[in-house]
Amino acid sequence: HSEESRRRTAENADRMLRSFEDMRAVHDFSFRRAVIFTAHCEGSVQDAYSPLDGDRILCADGGWKFAREAGVKPECVIGDFDSSEEPEGEAIERHPVMKDDTDTMLCVKRALKGGELDFLIVGGFGGRLDHTLANIQTMQYLAERGARAVMDDGITRAETLKEGKTRVSRKKGKLSVFSLTDKCEGVTIRGAKYE
């Protein structure tokens, strides 16, 4: 029952996204990108984040330090501040330590309420395994709602893919493709070592 409900929700989200994409193509308007700085970034913030006009910046807990390193001011710093001090001079949305969502998920939910459909999570890998897995689940949560999600820490980059074509630039490193669901059909890989 739950799996069927989740599938229907994802299908509805896909239809809505296609509708938004059609409207964007016809009316040439763009959606803002929500950029969420997490409290852990294994690599270079500058390699992970290139600013775009109109970026909506949110920070999950200690992610405010990486936002400052990137030279951007967050709309809000969201978290329980169990592992980081609160920043001076920033808008803060404080949550209890004992809660159902991670600080990153709280940022995602705030941005979704604002209508954002394009997400960059800066950091998110490395550090604690439970945080990495929770961030990957957060990307799946976004994909199920029709949003595009990228997580980049300057070393590793993950992106949710949906119907259509995606081109990956040839950079030094490795390419892996995984399904976050039990069924993934119609995927074709061309130009990679293993096709």
List each model region and its residues:
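Acidic/Gly/His-enriched mid-domain segments of enzyme catalytic cores or analogous surface patches
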Residues: 51-52, 62-145
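A cross-taxon signal for low-complexity, glycine/charged-rich
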Residues: 2-9
